[in-house]
């Protein structure tokens, strides 16, 4: 009896130790991100699905605030030796991350983990944004890439006597439509989120205009800003005139206008294609998705949109097991079924060609008109050297400068020319500072 008791106890102890060993063997991989609302739900779902199929690793997603806050937190954490394994960084933080000495290039992560990594699976115009010009390899992995699109309230269009299946194609048409929408009872005709990205950066690319010299900084850090030219000034003047009439309303520097749209306050907004998840969830009216408007007088417009959103950077200083798990997770995200579902649920671009083709085969675009607008904008025409994106140092700070100067226009303190001239001169100081720091 006594021996049996000892034997049973020994078995229990052995099992306990075995389970404990298995638990200890799980490598936790912190993943800091900026996805909130419905997007945050989808990020958690991706992590759960990976964790269920990979018993050796556990992705731990942590929301760290908006893009600016998350980038600052990630860099600060690296300096204190407490960085996450994966950090989501928005597209204009690319130059900052490249110069930070805080990252391990994603192609190197796969190589060291002995996991095959075919970089050609990514949509070229997306991958090009995050590729090292010297090596031709990806520094970070595209994740939630987007372009700005136009969302409009079809019910409000009907009420105003406008065609609900015909969103404005030009900025001139948008100005006319918003006046009619306001006259028909809309308290807000048009609003826009992310004004620097949409009204300056993408407006410039959409019209084939450079944002900065040196091919928007891709060819060197000695670039200077060039978005204070006649076409950009004309565009800001149009918005200023609309603002004075009450047809354009400014709600803030981020995506505040998206909530104003899906709450029914604003009849038209321009926002990230990634806003579709929240709009689909919250809007209680019929809505449509259209391409970004272009200036009717601009030659050869529209050209192609440049991407926004973010990519996933792998932080330096982690152990071998962590990097192996990171590589497994990043590979998981590129699986056609996973990447296609992420695209379909969120409104972000399909980051791989296979995800795009699978989405078409499934008939998703036929069932969801407008869901392919962001992709069509990106592929509208072959990109020019200065419409493939931008790679400018201190770009987050430059966007803040642009916000400040445009706010001077909306409050009537500055003319569009004065605001853009000042934004360029202030921004050039930041570019020069970045160049000197990273020589």
Curated annotation (Swiss-Prot):
BP-aspect Gene Ontology terms: transmembrane transport
Keyword Signal among UniProt keywords: yes
First and last residue of the signal peptide: 1-25
Keywords: Periplasm, Signal, Transport
Domain of life the protein comes from: Bacteria
GO cellular-component term (any): periplasmic space
Family membership: Belongs to the bacterial solute-binding protein 1 family.
Subunit description: The complex is composed of two ATP-binding proteins (UgpC), two transmembrane proteins (UgpA and UgpE) and a solute-binding protein (UgpB).
Role noted for this protein: Part of the ABC transporter complex UgpBAEC involved in sn-glycerol-3-phosphate (G3P) import. Binds G3P.
Name of the protein in its database record: sn-glycerol-3-phosphate-binding periplasmic protein UgpB
Organism listed in the record: Yersinia enterocolitica serotype O:8 / biotype 1B (strain NCTC 13174 / 8081)
Organism lineage string: Bacteria, Pseudomonadati, Pseudomonadota, Gammaproteobacteria, Enterobacterales
Encoding gene, per UniProt annotation: ugpB
């Amino acid at each position: 009896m006594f021996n049996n008791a000892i034997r049973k106890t020994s078995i229990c102890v052995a099992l306990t130790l075995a389970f404990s060993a298995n638990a200890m063997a799980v490598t936790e991989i912190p993943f800091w991100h900026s996805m909130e609302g419905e997007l945050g739900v989808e990020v958690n779902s991706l992590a759960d699905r990976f964790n269920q199929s990979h018993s050796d690793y556990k992705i731990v997603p942590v929301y760290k605030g908006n893009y600016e806050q998350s980038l600052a937190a990630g860099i600060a954490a690296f300096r204190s030796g407490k960085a996450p394994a994966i950090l989501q960084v928005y597209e204009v933080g690319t130059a900052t991350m490249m110069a930070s000495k805080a990252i391990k290039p994603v192609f190197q992560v796969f190589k060291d983990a002995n996991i095959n990594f075919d970089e050609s699976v990514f949509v070229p115009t997306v991958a090009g944004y995050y590729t090292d010009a010297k090596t031709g390899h990806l520094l970070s992995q595209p994740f939630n890439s987007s372009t700005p699109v136009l969302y409009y309230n079809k019910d409000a269009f009907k009420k105003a006597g406008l065609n609900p299946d015909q969103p404005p194609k030009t900025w001139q048409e948008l100005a006319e439509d918003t006046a009619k929408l306001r006259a028909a009872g809309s308290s807000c005709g048009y609003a826009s989120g992310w004004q620097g990205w949409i009204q300056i950066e993408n407006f410039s690319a959409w019209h084939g205009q450079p944002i900065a010299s040196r091919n928007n900084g891709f060819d060197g850090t000695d670039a200077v800003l060039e978005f204070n030219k006649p076409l950009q000034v004309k565009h800001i003047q149009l918005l200023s005139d609309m603002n004075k009439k009450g047809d354009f309303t400014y709600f803030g520097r981020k995506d505040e206008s998206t909530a104003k749209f899906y709450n029914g306050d604003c009849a038209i907004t321009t926002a990230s294609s990634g806003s579709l998840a929240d709009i689909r969830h919250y809007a209680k009216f019929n809505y449509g998705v259209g391409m970004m408007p272009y200036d009717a007088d601009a030659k050869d417009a529209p050209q192609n949109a440049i991407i926004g959103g973010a990519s996933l950077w792998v932080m330096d200083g982690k152990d071998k097991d962590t990097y192996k798990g990171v590589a497994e997770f990043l590979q998981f995200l590129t699986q056609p079924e996973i990447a296609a579902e992420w695209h379909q649920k969120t409104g972000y671009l399909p980051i791989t060609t296979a995800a795009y083709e699978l989405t078409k085969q499934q008939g998703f675009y036929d069932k969801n008109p407008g869901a392919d607008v962001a992709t069509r904008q990106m592929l509208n025409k072959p990109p020019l050297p200065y419409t493939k994106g931008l790679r400018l140092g201190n770009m987050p700070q430059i966007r803040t400068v642009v916000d400040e100067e445009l706010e001077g226009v909306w409050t009537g303190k500055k003319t569009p020319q004065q605001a853009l001239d000042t934004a360029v001169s202030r921004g050039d100081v930041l570019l020069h500072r970045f160049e000197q720091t990273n020589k």
